[in-house]
Structure formats: structure tokens, C-alpha cells
Amino acid sequence: MHPKTDHIEKIITENFRYIRDIKKIEAINHNDINSKNFLIYSKKSKYVLKFLKNNQQKRNKQIQRILYRANQNGIKVSIPIKNESKRKILDDVILSKFYNGKTFSGSVQELESFGYELAKLHKFLKKSKVKLQKDKNIGSYKLLSPKDITRIKKIIGQSSNPNKIDNMVKRRLEFLQQINQRHSEFQKKRKKFDEQLIHNDLHTDNIIFFKKNISVILDFYFMKRGTILEDVSYSALRLSEQTSKNFKNIEKMVNLFINTYSKYNKIHQNELLNLNYFLSKNSLARINHILRNRYFHDSNSWVQQLPLHFKLLDFSYKIKLEV
């Protein structure tokens, strides 16, 4: 075993002693900046070891209990493997089974399978009485104020060496201010929507298929209370964008997935009437988070995803709901 992975093998041998004969440990390349993941090869199976970076032990334990109960209710989620140690380190170190499979390929069968499984998940989460501790970073995803936009513009203007990210942000600031303002006004006057626990991070890497059917839904550590349409619309947009660059095809697939999901779990009409708001909500939050980090906290976390989320934000206000 390589010296760099010796400490990982030690964690496993001390806390998961029933996993024998570790053959190899590899770092997993992924988009989740909130954890560091490793693929563990043993003689009989493969596992994923996740080191959470959020320092929210209570929240992590709450989510793990939710996942255990979901699994017991037949929901296809990845559950932490119970350890044999009471050591504090295990509060933020999660071992789970590795699932073979592929990301979305664009088939109707995959959409049907995921729509059914997501509806089951939402029905289960709706019954949960857990008062989930809020993500401590949630504030960085809030709407940007006109003062924030002005501050970002000033920082870019004063830069002696702006790069292509800065130039892209500068070009989109007026549009971004309009969308943030639109969301702010909507949130002040909107009717109250039904909220429950939702996944809140259903991008393509967290939805795994095997033989065109859902194998597992991964990574629930961004969970929050929200509307089911937030999950449905964001996952529809991410799945659609992965398989086509043509707007009409993306619009068609988003509508197809909403209709597929609705066969198994009703989406309230007042939410559907505001589809563009929900379609744009997640990408706007992520853009705002990235810009706050970059310009206010000197951090480039997730900055590589900025072009994607600007593109999704553009799509969000062009897509029309088919009736």
C-alpha cells in the first residue's frame, strides 16, 4: 500500500474490521468540494470512503438516520456501513458500498425509472419529522443584492489582470442583477408553497443507472427543506443538458420528465405555474455561491462550474411548460 493511503487503510482496519484484504485505494475525482472520496478495493467487493468537510456532526448523523430508514422502506439510496468503533473520527468518515452503473444516457426508460424512484423518495421524505439542522454554508447561496453586484463589478474593474472567468462574469452582471431582483420580488409576494425535505443536489453524478434502471441515488449531504419541484426541475435540467445541446430537445426532455414524475407524485399547480422560478433557483444559488467565494472570500471553489450554471440559468427562463 502507498504511504499516502496508509492512514485510510488504518481507518478501515480499525473501524470496519469485517472488510478484509484491501488490495488498492484510489482517490475519486468528483465535483463535490464538501468531501474527499476514495475507492477501496477489497478481495470480495468495492467501497467508497467519504471524508466530509462540513464539520456538522449533528446534521451528518441526522442525514444518515434518514438514509437508513429510506433504505428500509425500499428507496434506492446509498447507506453508510455501520462501523465497529465509537471513535469521534467516524462522525465525519462515511463508508458505503460502491455501485456499478452509468450516468444518464438519454433514454425514456431511464427517465421513467428515475421519475418513479424520485417520487418514492419524496413521498418518504414528506413523512419525515426530522428537524434537520441547516447547512452552515446556506447563507452563501442567498440572493445577491444590488450592493453585492456593484461590489463585484468594482473588484473586477480594479483587477490588473482579469482572466476569462472575470470577463465572463462582467458581461453577465446586468443579467444576473435582473434575475436576483426578479427572485427577490417573487419571494416577497409569492403564495406559500408546500415544503418538505428534498435532496437538493440531483446532478448527473448523483443519479446512477444500471441496465437503464435506477441503481442508486447518491450524496444527500446537501439536503434541505424545499418544494419537490426544486428537485424535479433541477434534475430534469441537468439530465437534459447532459444529453443534448439543442434547446428544443432540452425543453422537450424537461417537460417529459415533469410529466413522468407527475404520474407517481402530484406536483401542485401553483408550483407548476411558476416553473421558470423553480428551474432557475438552483443554478442561481450556485452562481451566487461561486461569486461570493471568488470575489468576497478569495476562493475559487466550484468556479469551473460557472459557465454551466450560467447556461442552465439562460435555459431556465426560456423553457415553457407544455399543457
Give the role of each language-model region:
Residues 92-106, 154-158, 281-297:
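A glycine-centered beta->alpha junction motif in the catalytic cores
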Residues 1-82, 322-323:
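Conserved NTP-binding catalytic cores of kinases and kinase-like/nucleotidyltransferase enzymes
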Residues 151, 286-323:
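ATP/Mg2+ or Mg2+-diphosphate-binding catalytic cores
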Residues 229-266, 280-298:
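Active-site activation/catalytic loop segments of kinase-like enzymes and analogous catalytic loops
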Residues 32-43, 48-49, 181-230:
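Active-site acidic catalytic loop and adjacent metal/ATP-binding pocket
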